[in-house]
């Protein structure tokens, strides 16, 4: 017999590798040299789901991990009660994490059998605030602001529904508002809602029982 593919060994043999792990954690983030929308390119993005503790061979976590690699820094997740709420939020451990800037998925679970409505409500709530921001930015265009802020506001209005580049546009607008908002109530109000400048990526996670039976009447 060739032996088993996996063998249990003492954990003590791996303690010498702890400094290597610590070194890897301290490495600076690297830019992805490929387009992340390709199969190969997606794997150069940092996963924002790690160490889930899901069952061996679980088919859910690879999909969830891939989604975090593509959209994780601006994700909102409405999670149906089931396996994905067990490996996804078994307190005090949470497998969803953040990137080097502190951005990552925001996760919530409804114990009731209404995850479709729950996720839709999350999306509609965010859309309402962003609509308010769009109206306030349109009004702010008439204010005597700098050319740079004027251009940033117009760009945000023109591309508010585009996911590509939304983080960069939001950062630029937020930074300029921080410089010019003093004593201007409308700009102060906009800056207070700066967390919504980024176009959020809303996801609804659930199993086939929920999607095709329990909650099929909904979204």
Set out the residue ranges of the language-model regions:
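Gly-rich Lys/Arg/Thr-decorated short loops/hinges at beta-loop-alpha junctions or inter-strand turns
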Residues: 39-50, 170-174, 198
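A short, small-residue-rich loop immediately preceding and capping a beta-strand
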Residues: 75-79, 200-214
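Iron-sulfur cluster-binding cysteine motifs and their immediate structural context
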Residues: 1-14, 62, 72
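Mobile "lid/hinge" segments at catalytic clefts and subdomain interfaces of large enzymes
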Residues: 89-127
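N-terminal amphipathic, basic-rich helices that act as targeting or association modules
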Residues: 49-81, 85-92
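N-terminal leader/propeptide and maturation segments of large enzyme subunits in energy/redox metabolism
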Residues: 111-186
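Conserved small/polar residues in nucleotide/adenosyl-binding loops
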Residues: 219
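Flexible loop/turn segments at secondary-structure boundaries
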Residues: 13-16, 84-88, 210-214
